[in-house]
């Protein structure tokens, strides 16, 4: 799938809000309200992504929005739990040393000495830095099934090679 065709889920609709067709919005973006900055927004209807327009949005114990064409609560209820997405090419371009998490999933992780630690399976945030969840190779010499590696640039993460789909780390394979 080319970047032009790829869609990225950036949120989802929650329950309807009020009687005039408004919906609660759960945003997955760093700044929750920035979900409304992306154009066009897409929703998945019957296994197909379709564009929609936000008529208005506001903060009210979170985010709520009104979609164009929805006038009553019953119409809005049909959108509950639908995912909100954008086309990947609508996301801002990053510099060479910046990455979207989605780019790191599936990359091979190796130590500076060439030992294969496994594949990036997940990433999560902590208070100080992000952490790579690396699913270990089946025949890992250290008997590890999973490793948690802090994403600390230059100190732990040495090189990220997009072309080779490889991350080089300064990490003890026994840990």
Swiss-Prot record:
Is Membrane one of the keywords UniProt gives this record? no
Q: Name one GO molecular function term.
A: ribosome binding
* Keyword set, alphabetical order: Chaperone, Cytoplasm, Ribosome biogenesis, rRNA processing
One GO term (biological process)? rRNA processing
InterPro entries assigned to the protein according to its UniProt record, in alphabetical order: PRC_barrel-like_sf, PRC_RimM, RimM, RimM_N, RimM_N_sf, Transl_B-barrel_sf
Question: Which positions fall inside the PRC barrel domain?
Answer: 95-175
Q: List, alphabetically, the GO terms of the cellular component aspect.
A: cytoplasm; ribosome
Domain free text: The PRC barrel domain binds ribosomal protein uS19.
* UniProt similarity note: Belongs to the RimM family.
Purpose of the protein: An accessory protein needed during the final step in the assembly of 30S ribosomal subunit, possibly for assembly of the head region. Essential for efficient processing of 16S rRNA. May be needed both before and after RbfA during the maturation of 16S rRNA. It has affinity for free ribosomal 30S subunits but not for 70S ribosomes.
Recorded hits in NCBIfam families, A to Z, give: 16S_RimM
Assembly state and interactors? Binds ribosomal protein uS19.
The protein here is known as Ribosome maturation factor RimM
The top of its lineage is: Bacteria, Pseudomonadati, Pseudomonadota, Gammaproteobacteria, Vibrionales
